[in-house]
Amino acid sequence: KLIGIVTERDLLFANSKNLIQDVMTKDVITAKSGVSIDEAKELLHNHRIEKLPLVNESGLVTGLITSKDITNNADYPNASKDNKGRPLVGAAVGVKGDFLERSESLLEAGADTLVVDIAHGHSENAISTVKHIKKAFPNCELIAGNIATAQGAEDLMKAGVDAVKVGVGSGSICITRVITGSGVPQLTAVMDCAKIGRDYGIPIISDGGTRTSGDATKALAAGASTVMVGSMLGGTDESPGTVLTKNGKRFKVYRGMASLAAS
């Protein structure tokens, strides 16, 4: 039940020894579940607040609308969201150990799609993992990769994936081709896999080698339905890497998906 709200303003000059009940705002402005965006905007503006808790008839919290939610909704109307208005989220799992338990926990936490994400996706472990996840969670949207051949794409599609991630060694920091001596140039790999994808009605994701807008255009023209980017966004404020400063310039730590640091 809602008894108060704590925002950044409440904590700004608070003593670290203070209890939550001592710093929280107790007289909270609320709205009923199902309030419209326009009604929420009016309440936020009239009361000069930034956060609006939503409560049901029993006073239990059912949601929260913030001023940033409303501005983001207006600024980015085409953002990919779920039926609750939240950004779509994908979560990666491996192919060993407790991947089923991890998959269940991620789906319960609200993940919209799972990704069986390993450096060599055309392997018995990856195919077996796909089959087990789809059997346990048949309604789960499942992506698997990475692969670089038509046969790899077909084997994953037969196993039950909903999308295939294509790209081995093409990423900006990927060394798989160098270490293994195996790989396919990205455009060729996408074209080969897209042919199989069309036969099965399953989309292809081009993952790697997208350093410019032109690279994305080529991947889409070659048959990819989606393009994944890493290095293009790796230095943004929103990316999760640690910030380092070298010679007065700011950098972000950037890791490969199969690196020891990432795992």
Task: Set out the residue ranges of the language-model regions.
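Catalytic cores of alpha/beta
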Residues: 101-109, 142, 148-166, 206, ...
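A glycine-centered beta-loop-beta connector
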Residues: 1-7, 44, 52-68
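Bateman (tandem CBS) regulatory domains
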Residues: 18-28, 83-88, 108, 136, ...
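Active-site-adjacent beta->alpha loops and helix N-cap segments on the catalytic face
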Residues: 60-80, 98-101, 118-142, 147-158, ...
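Catalytic beta/alpha-barrel core
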Residues: 30-32, 51, 92-94, 112-123, ...
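Alpha/beta catalytic cores of nucleotide-metabolism and tRNA/nucleoside-modifying enzymes
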Residues: 31-32, 92, 159-162, 181-206, ...
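Short beta-strand/loop segments at the ligand-binding rim of alpha/beta enzyme cores
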Residues: 82-92, 132-148, 163, 196-208
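The conserved cystathionine-beta-synthase
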Residues: 31-48, 55, 71-74, 100-105
